[in-house]
């Protein structure tokens, strides 16, 4: 049986551009793609933290070390410069592969600088009143 797991995530990157008239896609700083293991033209899911929009497009490479996150084409209606995004990729694998698989999660500060990476998410704990 095949299951689908989180492959990689760019967590809380800031949208730098929103280009309605550019060919559809999301341009992502090439260094971010490398660190997260995202391939150019790979399908990505984008979750807009500011407005709740969730949409699918594909990644293209932007110039490295620029911090560019440009939402292009029709998707430009779903994200504006300054919006915080979570960009995720997923992979299908069999259950044996899934037992050993670890995603790559890349975390950012407000200036689109990488702060750290992880391959697990801390357990969510109940908040005390």
From Swiss-Prot:
* Major place of residence: cytoplasm
Q: Report the PTM annotation.
A: Is synthesized initially as an inactive proenzyme, which is activated by self-cleavage at a specific serine bond to produce a beta-subunit with a hydroxyl group at its C-terminus and an alpha-subunit with a pyruvoyl group at its N-terminus.
Cellular compartments per GO CC: cytosol
Query: Does the record's keyword annotation contain Cytoplasm?
Result: yes
Name one matching Pfam family. Asp_decarbox
GO biological process, any = alanine biosynthetic process
Indicate the quaternary assembly: Heterooctamer of four alpha and four beta subunits.
User: So what does this one do?
Assistant: Catalyzes the pyruvoyl-dependent decarboxylation of aspartate to produce beta-alanine.
Q: What is this protein called?
A: Aspartate 1-decarboxylase
**The species this protein was found in:** Hydrogenovibrio crunogenus (strain DSM 25203 / XCL-2) (Thiomicrospira crunogena)
């Amino acid at each position: 049986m095949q299951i689908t797991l989180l492959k990689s995530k760019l967590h809380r990157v800031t949208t730098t551009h929103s280009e309605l008239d550019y060919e559809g896609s999301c341009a992502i700083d090439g260094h971010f793609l490398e660190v997260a293991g995202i391939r150019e033209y790979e399908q990505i899911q984008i979750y807009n933290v500011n407005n709740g929009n969730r949409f699918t497009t594909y990644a293209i490479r932007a110039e490295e070390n620029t911090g560019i996150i440009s939402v292009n084409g029709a998707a430009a209606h779903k994200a504006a410069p300054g919006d915080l995004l979570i960009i995720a990729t997923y992979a299908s694998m069999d259950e044996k592969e899934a037992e050993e698989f670890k995603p790559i999660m890349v975390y950012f500060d407000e200036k689109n600088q990488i702060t750290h990476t992880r391959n697990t998410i801390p357990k969510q704990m109940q908040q005390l009143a």
